[in-house]
Amino acid sequence: MGTHLHITAWVLGIILFFVAFALAGKNDKGAKIVHMIVRLLYLIIIATGVELYVRTGMKIPGFGGEYIGKMILGILVIGFMEMTLVRKKKGKSVTGVLIGFIIFAIVTILLGLRLPIGFHIF
């Protein structure tokens, strides 16, 4: 596993999240299947993130706290994604959790781009 698998899982997860968001609230089989696939991607994202941290993040001095912070932010992003889908499915307001998802996703991505592992844009 590696950085590319982690990023690919995130990209697929976010794309399928928006597909599931568009389908949520409709009581059809397709919406449930997409939501389950997104949940599977959550597990893959968490597993690859932990693997990246254990394999390389722990060995880079001076960045331990930032990697742990990024893991916490990543889990919060996944939590907001799931809360958004469940609230939409139940017909409740999703504005707050959707804004939370967007804010935490942006912060997590920016922190990830700042850290030594992965792509170096900054």
From Swiss-Prot:
Listed InterPro entries: UPF0344
Taxonomic superkingdom: Bacteria
Main location group: membrane
Subcellular location: Cell membrane
Membrane topology classification: Multi-pass membrane protein
Keywords from the UniProt entry: Cell membrane, Membrane, Transmembrane, Transmembrane helix
Gene Ontology CC: plasma membrane
Residues passing through the membrane, by range: 5-25, 33-53, 60-80, 93-113
Pfam families xref list: DUF1516 (PF07457)
HAMAP family named in the record: UPF0344 (MF_01536)
NCBIfam families, per database record: PRK13673.1-5
Family according to the record: Belongs to the UPF0344 family.
Record-given protein name: UPF0344 protein BPUM_1008
